[in-house]
């Protein structure tokens, strides 16, 4: 097992930033014992050596620049810092391009059609099949096999398998994992005289709290959830109550299951009672936006949202995190989890450089730094200790505790097709146009037809 660091790392990537810093510190330490003239000379020599090291790396990288596509602006600062380390070591420059989720896949599809995909980009379980079946992604299988730094067994197998097309071609390297937790407004709880959420909470406790936290004038609601928020929203309670979205063999829908109907009905009943904003409000405002504005007391949200929520002044002053409630009957407290992958265009003009970046981003060093900076929960095993400390004002441990009972985000070859259909049809349940049971029957029929055509 080859790990990052030591002589092996230096041979592959050149001097690390840490090594340069240590060398610089040593030079400064010696200089402090010299005369002013000698100190100046030592400083110039130090600068010269640093410049030569940087220049050597740039020459090794050929001055090339990789285009990197992501959709989350909150992760850009941390990823830039990590990629700067990569550039210092290899000379290969990177340019991150941020396209919001709503336009990201349209941008990629246009790039794939026009032959102008970014060199390296994020891949998702929703979309991997589309790009895999049309051979749009660089096959990393042999490169991973020959790598002396990547340790694929350190990543969750379910995440690795998402990006292993038909069980053979590895088309992406895991970037992260995510879990779901409960965010709550401590100030609102205090005003209502309600104890903060903890591991004893059931969904019934949650419902009772939502009722007490709702103000009759519409200025404050107990919670909020959108029909489009599947992984971080309604999916978790569906699985807690014994339901599911898609069967394990990915051949049939789970919307005819008693637990699925029960979980969704639980939520829509609370909406009908007025304990959550009506559909027309959540259609225009994301849950986190309402939470940050002090309009709702509770939301469920993914760990990927930490940079936004934890850096919001209102949230910092008033809110905290707890594990999700559990089902009173089954005792289940499930978190739907997922993980992004680093992929490259099959037609990139810089396949070796793209691979080097992906290899680096999947290394223990980069994965550790990603966690340390609080960007996300890294996928590499054993790198989460410092992630918990990245936002000390909040109970980040709740997200790690949710890893105890996790279910991979539902997906198949046509995920986006049936996911969009589900989102559209759930609107009728959210706004009360149809009963939740009737909507589930409609979804079941259409989803099974879609799965049969995969």
Question: Which residues does each PLM region occupy?
Answer:
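Hinge/lid segment of periplasmic solute-binding proteins
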Residues: 56-60, 126-181, 318-322, 388-392, ...
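Short, solvent-exposed loop/beta-turn-alpha elements that line the ligand-binding surface or hinge
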Residues: 59, 141-155, 199, 223, ...
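Extracytoplasmic/periplasmic substrate-recognition and gating elements
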Residues: 64-67, 84-89, 93, 168, ...
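Extracytoplasmic "Venus flytrap"/periplasmic binding protein-like
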Residues: 85-155, 191-193, 290, 294-298, ...
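A structural signal for short loop-to-beta-strand junctions that line the ligand-binding cleft
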Residues: 110-111, 116-119, 148-188, 221, ...
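Long, aromatic- and glycine/proline-rich binding clefts that accommodate carbohydrate-like moieties
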Residues: 161, 322, 372-420, 424, ...
């Amino acid at each position: 097992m080859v790990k990052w660091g030591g002589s092996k790392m230096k041979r592959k990537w050149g001097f690390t930033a840490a090594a340069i810093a240590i060398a610089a510190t040593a030079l400064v330490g010696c200089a402090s014992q010299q005369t002013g003239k000698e100190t100046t000379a030592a400083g110039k020599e130090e600068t010269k050596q640093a410049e030569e090291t940087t220049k050597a790396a740039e020459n090794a990288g050929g001055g090339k620049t990789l285009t990197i596509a992501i959709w989350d602006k909150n992760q850009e600062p941390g990823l830039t810092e990590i990629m700067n380390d990569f550039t210092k070591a290899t000379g290969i420059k990177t340019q991150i391009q941020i396209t919001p989720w709503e336009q990201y896949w349209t941008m990629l599809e246009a790039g794939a059609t026009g032959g102008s995909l970014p060199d390296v980009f994020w891949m998702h379980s929703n979309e991997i099949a589309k790009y895999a079946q049309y051979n749009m992604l660089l096959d990393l299988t042999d490169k991973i096999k020959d790598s002396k730094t990547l340790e694929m067994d350190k990543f969750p197998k379910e995440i690795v398998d998402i990006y292993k097309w038909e069980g053979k071609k590895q088309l992406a390297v895991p970037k992260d994992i995510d879990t779901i937790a409960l965010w709550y407004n401590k100030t609102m709880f205090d005003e209502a005289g309600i104890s903060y959420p903890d591991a004893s909470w059931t969904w019934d406790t949650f419902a009772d709290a939502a009722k007490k936290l709702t103000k009759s004038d519409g200025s404050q609601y107990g919670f909020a959830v959108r029909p489009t928020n599947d992984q971080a929203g309604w999916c978790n309670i569906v699985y807690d109550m014994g339901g599911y979205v898609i069967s394990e063999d990915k051949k049939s829908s789970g919307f005819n299951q008693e637990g699925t109907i029960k979980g969704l009905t639980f939520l829509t009943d609370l909406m009908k009672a007025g304990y959550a904003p009506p559909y027309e409000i959540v259609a225009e405002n994301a849950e986190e936006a309402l939470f940050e504005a002090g309009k709702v007391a509770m939301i469920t949200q993914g760990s990927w949202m930490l940079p936004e929520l934890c850096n919001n002044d209102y949230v910092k002053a008033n809110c905290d995190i707890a594990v999700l409630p559990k089902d009173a009957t089954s005792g289940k407290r499930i978190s739907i989890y997922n993980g992004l992958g680093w992929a490259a265009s099959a037609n990139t003009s810089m396949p070796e450089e793209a691979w080097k970046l992906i290899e680096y981003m999947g290394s223990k060093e980069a994965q550790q730094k990603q966690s340390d900076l609080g960007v996300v929960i890294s996928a590499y095993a054993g790198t989460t200790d410092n992630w918990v400390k990245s936002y000390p004002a909040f109970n980040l441990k709740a997200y790690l505790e949710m890893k105890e009972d996790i279910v991979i985000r539902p997906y198949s070859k046509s995920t986006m097709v049936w996911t969009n259909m589900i989102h559209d049809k759930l609107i009728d349940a959210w706004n009360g146009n149809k009963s939740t049971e009737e909507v589930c029957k409609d979804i079941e029929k259409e989803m099974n037809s879609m799965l049969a055509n995969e």
